[in-house]
Structure formats: C-alpha cells, structure tokens
C-alpha cells in the first residue's frame, strides 16, 4: 500500500484526491488544504473543494488547514504520518524545504512544463489560443515549478472549450497520471526541465478582463480564459457574458454593429468579427444582447462600447 499525504485546494485537486481514495493501492494518510475563506457578496465562510470532499468521503482522515507552513509543528505532525509520497495539486502556497524533505513530493501542474510555470497555466493556455495543453507530474524542489518531470499527459483543446471544460479534462488526466507515477516511481527516469524554454504566468488580476474590439480571435480567447473570473468587459463596464467567434478575418470599425438577428448581435473588430449573445450592464441583470441594443436604440452601423 502506497501511503500518501495529499495537499491541494480547488476542484482540480479534488478530482485527483478522489482518484487516490478510490485506488486499492493507495492509502491517503492525511489531507492538507487552504483555510476556509469568505465567498460571495455575503462573504460567507466557505470550505475549499478538497476539504468538502475529505469530510464527505473520508471524515476520519486527518485534515489540516494551516495558515503558515513554516510553523514547526506542521512538518513534525506530517512526518509522524510516515507518508511514502506527498502529492501536491494546486495547493496555493510554496512549500518550505522542511516539508519537501519529509518524503518525495510530486506536483501535478496543469501545463506541459517548462511552459507556463506559476499560478494560472490553464488560463494562460486558453488566452494564447493554444491548440494543446496538458499536465505534468514533477518532482518538487525549491523554486517555482522547476523540478524534474516524471511524466506528462497531453490534451487537445477544442475551440469551444472554456476554462471550466479544460479544467475538468486536465483534472481527469492528472488523476490518472498521478496513479501511474506513484505505482511506477522507482522505474521512472526523470527528465530535467530546460530553463531556456520556460515561461511564467502570474495570478490573474481583475483588470485583465478589460477588452476592446481589436482582434476577434484574441478577444474570444480572453473570453474562454476569463469567463469564470474576472469575466470580460468593455471600458463602459458592459460585461460580455456569452460570445462566439464568427470570423478571424475582415476589417471593420472597432465595435461596429454589423447585424442584429435572433441569433444575437454581430460586432466587428479591427480584425474579424464576433457574435454577442448575452451581456450585463453595471448593476443590472444579465440579458440577451438583442434586448440590450434595442433598449439602447442601437442599430446596424452604430458602435457598441
């Protein structure tokens, strides 16, 4: 039986954790997740998905939510669990060396390393319009996602996929890859990352959702990447809640309404065009785009801004 201490926080990590629980060859000896955080307008204290899964499926498994990993007691308690491995998936904090030294630490990073090291690899892959993504199992060491690679799983990104769908696909691939690496760990010949090929992605900021009608394909890719948060919005703070890419070519006045029909509002970009289906004005409810432009008395040839 392979003894695993698991560290993770969001739904991506929950999928991996549940695969470990349902494996007959793995024993999860402890779960570490971020502390509960206020969520929504009411700021209700909400447990992360990994904690919810732990309480539902394995309520007797030791569960830890440390504020500060550098406190000596955490390394002491986790070492006492005698894990063979520490599996880390989107935990959200950098692990100090004292924890890395407890047992081999395997991180499931949602990119093909060394591409997109850092906090938002899935969003970055969509924002750049990549045709492929994937997950990497990496032997952790001090530094940001720079350890030796133990295995990868590739995923072809379909054009209609947004961030939620790609998250789901990568989580399933990561779960399968985790079990494979744990079972074959002693046989694997790790591959060092080539630093010259590396790229980095930071934590997403709200202002990155600001868009303009310059390039239709790039705007659509921003929508795919940021649909969950922060969303995409114009300078007027009008949120574009649902859009589709019509054409990557064709030159238009930026924001010009090209057509209004039952399928939505077609808007031109400096390069290409989009169909807008749903929008949301500041402090208003989400409405279909046709109702919005009709309410604003906008017609074909007018500018949406």
From Swiss-Prot:
One of its GO terms (molecular function) is methionyl-tRNA formyltransferase activity. Keywords: Protein biosynthesis, Transferase. This is Methionyl-tRNA formyltransferase. It holds the Pfam family Formyl_trans_N. NCBIfam families: fmt (TIGR00460). Belongs to the Fmt family. It comes from Wolinella succinogenes (strain ATCC 29543 / DSM 1740 / CCUG 13145 / JCM 31913 / LMG 7466 / NCTC 11488 / FDC 602W) (Vibrio succinogenes). (6S)-5,6,7,8-tetrahydrofolate binds at residues 111-114. It is an enzyme of class 2 (transferase). The keyword Isomerase does not apply. Gene3D superfamilies: 3.40.50.12230. One of its GO terms (cellular component) is cytosol. It catalyses: L-methionyl-tRNA(fMet) + (6R)-10-formyltetrahydrofolate = N-formyl-L-methionyl-tRNA(fMet) + (6S)-5,6,7,8-tetrahydrofolate + H(+).
